[in-house]
């Protein structure tokens, strides 16, 4: 299964045009994510594909907690421009910041992502 969460998490300082969620709002919505799903989010999880140009992590704690708890096979995110096309792992979960360029992933018949 696939599960998605849109919007910037945590709330960003970009003004009224930005659709954002608080960490608490994201936690509630992520409760419905099935175990071992493919998780598609706008924001990355904290400490995975989330560093800005200055090296500051901008990712979401709520998304990271959901990854640790639900163990998705794959997490596809974007949002943090300086980390586009980066890959990382949280446990057995592959995290990919696809950015606007996209990324090519290989999924084996047994569900392994590389």
Give residue ranges: language-model regions.
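Binuclear metal-dependent phosphoesterase catalytic core
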Residues: 8, 64-74, 82-114
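Generic alpha-helix signal with a bias toward terminal, lower-confidence helices
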Residues: 14-17, 53, 79, 92, ...
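Histidine-centered catalytic micro-motifs
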Residues: 40-45, 73-83
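Conserved catalytic scaffold of divalent metal-dependent phosphoesterases
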Residues: 1-58, 62
């Amino acid at each position: 299964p696939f599960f998605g969460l849109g919007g910037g998490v945590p709330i960003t300082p970009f003004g009224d045009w930005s659709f954002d969620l608080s960490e608490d709002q994201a936690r509630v919505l992520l409760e419905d994510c099935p175990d071992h799903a493919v998780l598609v989010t706008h924001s990355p999880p904290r400490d995975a594909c989330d560093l800005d140009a200055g090296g500051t992590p901008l990712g979401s704690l709520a998304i990271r907690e959901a990854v640790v708890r639900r163990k998705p096979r794959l997490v596809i995110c974007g949002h943090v421009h300086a980390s586009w096309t980066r890959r990382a792992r949280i446990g057995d979960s592959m995290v990919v910041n696809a950015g606007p360029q996209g990324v090519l992933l290989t999924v084996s018949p047994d569900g392994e992502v590389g």
